[in-house]
Amino acid sequence: MFSKQDQIQGYDDALLAAMNAEEQRQEDHIELIASENYTSKRVMQAQGSGLTNKYAEGYPGKRYYGGCEHVDKVEALAIERAKQLFGADYANVQPHSGSSANGAVYLALLQAGDTILGMSLAHGGHLTHGAKVSSSGKLYNAVQYGIDTNTGLIDYDEVERLAVEHKPKMIVAGFSAYSKTLDFPRFRAIADKVGALLFVDMAHVAGLVAAGLYPNPIPFADVVTTTTHKTLRGPRGGLILAKSNEEIEKKLNAAVFPGAQGGPLMHVIAAKAVCFKEALEPGFKAYQQQVIENAQAMAQVFIDRGYDVVSGGTDNHLFLVSLIRQGLTGKDADAALGRAHITVNKNAVPNDPQSPFVTSGLRIGTPAVTTRGFKVAQCVALAGWICDILDNLGDADVEADVAKNVAALCADFPVYR
């Protein structure tokens, strides 16, 4: 029998030390990885609840196990809030991740060997959009589109040309490193021209979409997926959305369970429900507006300091800095910034001469720092410190000076007060 007073402390101190060290790292490092954010304590409370004990294969009202009357209410709340938040007619809250949500979409609507047209990983797409190392590139005939390297914008004429040439069963619109606004009506028109399904992966911008600050793909796409973390600021998980289409809804449900997953993670679904409720609050739009303003201000600092920002700026929460002209690598820049307690990620840029393990760029995002309370003034200062380190890469004195500034800023803006 377990006791309600059981604690990790004193039972598994090695694990607790690692957990505490990570929590401290989050407090005393500045987080600029575009896909990371901080959840509320309410989200954490749901994830740490007794719901983790309950198996609930199936869907609300149609379970394969008994005792699901309460978790049915939990999942129903999450579904209804997701639909309300994004203006969707259908929502599946069970996918364990964004990648599993994408995999379920492919399983539901494609046959092995079908052609998909997605954005190249090297140009800002995601692994699950047809990269050769991913199952999406192994199970399906993946054709890749990219950006115009002169403008840094998606070349929609190329997308259309490739669609006409290859006749894909599905066109995938979405990204992991693209800072401009996707043209969903154009994607829809191209899909209709060749008789393709349009699948939008809005994982990175879901929070902006929910706040009405980025175009909503639901009216244009046959199916939409997202993660529930990143800009949405919830637990790590996936979500599938669609407008009303009974045939597609049945296929999607069957693809998630039993097609791709067994029992849903009810504690995570509860945390998703909390996240959606938080995103429906009026203050969420102000947060997302600040995310965009902070990203735009930071991008301008890099431009003013002589760095190339891919696409010339940003419309959303992230931007890419190319270091090719400076002769620097993303790997070295990432490491130097890490020593100053600034966390970013190295990232490939268009026409990158380096390998994906080295790269010539950095991806920078503002969701996490905005959650801490950073405004434009703090983000401008932060971008300047990053440029100082890049201008003097490997200079320990510069790194130490920046680290002191970072420590002071983190102390002024704790993650959890």
From Swiss-Prot:
Its cofactor is pyridoxal 5'-phosphate. It is found in: Cytoplasm. GO terms for biological process: glycine biosynthetic process from serine; tetrahydrofolate interconversion. It catalyses: (6R)-5,10-methylene-5,6,7,8-tetrahydrofolate + glycine + H2O = (6S)-5,6,7,8-tetrahydrofolate + L-serine. One of its GO terms (molecular function) is glycine hydroxymethyltransferase activity. Keywords: Amino-acid biosynthesis, Cytoplasm, One-carbon metabolism, Pyridoxal phosphate, Transferase. The modification N6-(pyridoxal phosphate)lysine is found at residue 230. One of its GO terms (cellular component) is cytosol. The keyword Cell inner membrane does not apply. Homodimer. This is Serine hydroxymethyltransferase 1. The gene is glyA1.
